[in-house]
Regions:
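A nucleotide-sugar donor-handling region in carbohydrate enzymes
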Residues: 124-189, 217-219
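C-terminal alpha-helical cap of glycosyltransferases
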Residues: 331-361
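A short, well-ordered alpha-helix in the C-terminal region of glycosyltransferases
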Residues: 311, 318-332
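Active-site and donor-binding regions of nucleotide-sugar-utilizing enzymes
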Residues: 10-20, 25-34, 38, 45-144, ...
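Donor-nucleotide binding loops and adjacent catalytic segments primarily
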Residues: 166, 172-248
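Conserved donor-binding/catalytic loop of nucleotide-activated donor transferases
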Residues: 246-249, 263-270, 288
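Acidic donor-binding loop of glycosyltransferase active sites
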Residues: 246-258
Length: 361
């Protein structure tokens, strides 16, 4: 088996119950692996099935999983898939992963990389990656031999955001445009609630909602845009997103992955987190000066949001300072650094010897 050219297997799911965040983390990482000419294969349970087109569009292969990650029978199916592909590494991403699951994968001789943004389990694998700013090293439990890649240097940023980083080196003139990006797991429909509030603010001329077509309330957002045509739009395509990123003056986010991608571009942000992991991330962004943390989304009132928006839009130096801090915080090279960490392990003499002995069909 040639370790240098072996493919990478991704075990992740994307469903309404478990969310799609970990799935898109894997897609971003797969794009970085392909830049190193690594084959990428997804073994995933997807809902809706149209997500398979997203996988294929990124030049990845996909095999449907019959069960959810961590459910009975999934471990055996994942091992069979890894042996069929002669995979050199398995990337596992999901909240239902247990230490025993990762330990059994490691016993096969495959390198195990796990995405974990919650630090909820003790990790026995080779690599643990947290693409968020928090939690930090002290929160994680891991066994001897496990390497951790945590923090801002390993934030995953899609190519569309990296390409706009240089173009948006200077802010565009008014009127002011706002971006609303609460991610795909916006089950409380904060995107619509906050967009309605932004439309009531005289300083905001237009609002662009960044989301995907499988957003839990996508059809409601479409109806809302139809009523407010001219001032509100939904942006789902990459080509449309490129122009909106350059023109945006302020963004409302929940502190998730898209918030860090907007930091790479340099757009000032107001964060209203909806999840504990996002809460820690949003607070760190505020500490670094890249965003203003307003509090949990359920607690922020219209008056608080209105005051925060006015402060940012009325002061160009405030926007400039936030933009510079954000660009210094996230440089867009996190995916490549994670690939480097994985390649170092794959090329180590200890791993190559174990892989030859253990990974048998």
């Amino acid at each position: 088996m040639d370790v240098k050219r072996g493919p990478i297997l991704f075990r992740c799911d994307g469903t309404p119950d478990q969310g799609w965040e970990s799935f898109y983390h894997c897609l971003s990482f797969a794009a970085a692996l392909q830049r190193r000419r690594r084959g990428t294969h997804f073994f995933s349970y997807l809902e809706p099935l149209s997500l398979a087109q997203v996988i294929h569009r990124g030049n990845n292969d996909w095999a449907p999983a019959e069960t959810l990650l961590g459910s009975p029978g999934d471990l055996e199916a994942t091992i069979r898939q890894a042996r069929r592909l002669h995979a050199t590494a398995v990337v596992v991403a999901g909240s239902n992963v247990s230490p025993d699951y990762l330990k059994e994968l490691r016993k096969t001789g495959i390198t195990v990389l796990a995405f974990d943004t919650d630090a909820a389990i003790k990790h026995p694998g080779h690599l643990v990656v947290n693409p968020y700013l928090s939690p930090g090293l002290k929160a994680y439990k891991f066994e001897l031999g496990t390497q951790l890649l945590l923090g801002r240097r390993f934030a995953l940023v899609r190519g569309v955001f990296r390409r706009q980083r240089t173009i948006r080196a200077t802010e565009q003139p008014g009127p002011f445009r706002a971006l609303v990006a609460f991610g795909d797991d916006d089950f409380g429909n904060q995107a619509r609630v906050r967009t309605e509030q932004l439309l009531e603010m005289p300083k905001v001329d237009k609002v662009s909602i960044l989301c995907r077509t499988h957003h839990p309330h996508y059809h409601e957002l479409e109806d809302f845009v139809g009523v407010n045509k001219g001032r509100v739009e939904i942006v789902t395509e990459t080509k449309e997103m490129m122009t909106r990123l350059v023109r945006g003056h302020i963004a409302l986010t929940s502190g998730e992955a898209c918030a860090l991608e907007l930091c790479c571009v340099g757009i000032p942000q107001l964060t209203l987190p909806t999840k504990p992991a996002h809460l820690l991330n949003a607070k760190r962004m505020d500490d670094e000066g890249a965003a203003t943390f307003l509090g949990a989304a359920s607690d922020v009132t219209f008056d608080q949001l209105h005051e925060a928006v006015n402060i940012v839009l009325e002061d160009p130096m405030e926007r400039l300072g936030m933009s510079r801090c954000a660009r210094n915080l996230i440089d867009g090279r996190g995916g490549d650094r994670i690939v480097n960490g994985l390649e170092i392990i794959l090329h180590s003499p200890q791993y190559r010897e174990k892989a030859k002995l253990k990974l048998v069909a």
